[in-house]
């Protein structure tokens, strides 16, 4: 875990050095099987605490598809597939996002990109930060 933490810190320092960040959302990791991810979650939050970020929030994983599932029960693999489909549809429908389509389509971890995108979109919309419809 120390190696992961050091690498993460280096990547954050390089990627974010010229960006002012005043808000960070981190998907809350739950359950005993997610112990490693829970540790990384803590490292991410600690990094931004040390950088003086004003708002750091943990948000539930279930949020990202709430606006699309309408309380329908789904299995893990169904949610992964749906998040990819929903993200692709949004990218195709929003002209200002078209340039992201090739990156998304070619990426080997589409499910992770989709989850992050939808989680961010949910947060922006439900915190009235901009009109994200």
Regions found by a protein language model. Give the residues of each.
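Phosphate- and other anionic-substrate recognition elements at nucleic-acid/protein interfaces
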Residues: 1-133
